[in-house]
Structures are given as structure tokens and as C-alpha cells.
């Protein structure tokens, strides 16, 4: 075999090994991505089904909310947050907040309200809804967009918001 033939043979073998290694790496990474995506999906599903009580919501997100007594809320993604596509995922949020009496009074006075019930309340939140509410509605446009509803009789605030 000539010197040139040996060089071509070595180059061919090396190229084949590199191509095989790359194909194996791509397969391995794709397999791990599927596992990560499945883990992400199960975490999102668990989050969606768990009524949250964390004090995530403040004056910054819902002006006039004050130092509320308690809160129960849910978040649901508008699209697949586990997708490998670039870009953020918008989230929908709903929740009930029991306001302090002085905060409920101040909030009612600070905004223009109209009588209107919420269009939809997610079933998992229904246990936290007041009995026989007299809902008043107004819009907010902060980091979150949507509507808030106030039942002045109980000082309960219901929010239905989307970020993004």
C-alpha cells in the first residue's frame, strides 16, 4: 500500500469513528432530553393540581391587595413550558384572597367597579369562594393582565390574570 493509500485509509477510519461517536452522542442527548421533558411535565402537572397558599401576590402584582389574611391560588401554563422551543411561556392564574376589612374598603374606593361575576372559576378553587357573593369587577394592567372581582360583603378578592 502506498503512503497516500495509508493516509486515506487512516482518514477514512478516523472520519467513520468520529461520525459514529457524534451519532451516539446525539442519540444519548436526545434520550436524556426525553427523560427531562417527562420529569418537567410531571412537575408542571403536579403544580397545576395543587392549590397554592404562598404569598406570591403582592401590591406589585395586584395594587390594593394589602397585607391580606389568606390566599388560595392556582397557576396553569398557556402552552407547553417543557417544550425545547425558545421563549417564555405565559401562565394563567386564578385565586381567592381574603382581604383585611380596611384593605377591602380602600380597594373598593380606589377603583371604578361594575357589577359582574367572574366568567369562570376553576373547580379546584370553588371551596374557597364565598357563599352568595355580590361580585364587582375591574381590570388591572400591571405585570399581569386581567380582571379582579371584589365581594365587598366578605372582603374576598378573586383574580383571573395572565402574565405576558
Give the location of each predicted region.
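N-terminal export/targeting and maturation segments
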Residues: 22-90
